[in-house]
Amino acid sequence: MTGEIFFVAGLVFVLTLVGMAIGFGVLKLRGEGKEA
């Protein structure tokens, strides 16, 4: 039971990290492309 909690928490943490990285990359590419 305890293992499932840690697994879900880790999964959410990794997904959040990946989402932030993708969002940051998209914003950076847009900023460099338009310079707005």
UniProtKB/Swiss-Prot annotation:
Gene Ontology CC annotations of this record: cytochrome b6f complex; plasma membrane
- One family from Pfam that matches here is PetM
Q: Write down the membrane topology.
A: Single-pass membrane protein
| Location of this chain's protein in the cell | Cell inner membrane
GO molecular-function annotation terms? electron transfer activity
* Keywords, alphabetical: Cell inner membrane, Cell membrane, Electron transport, Membrane, Photosynthesis, Transmembrane, Transmembrane helix, Transport
Q: Name one GO biological process term.
A: photosynthesis
Q: Which residues cross the membrane?
A: 5-25
Q: What is its main location?
A: membrane
Q: How does it assemble?
A: The 4 large subunits of the cytochrome b6-f complex are cytochrome b6, subunit IV (17 kDa polypeptide, PetD), cytochrome f and the Rieske protein, while the 4 small subunits are PetG, PetL, PetM and PetN. The complex functions as a dimer.
Q: Which family does it belong to?
A: Belongs to the PetM family.
> What is the protein's known function?
Component of the cytochrome b6-f complex, which mediates electron transfer between photosystem II (PSII) and photosystem I (PSI), cyclic electron flow around PSI, and state transitions.
What protein name is recorded for this chain? Cytochrome b6-f complex subunit 7
Q: What is the lineage of its organism?
A: Bacteria, Bacillati, Cyanobacteriota, Cyanophyceae, Gloeobacterales
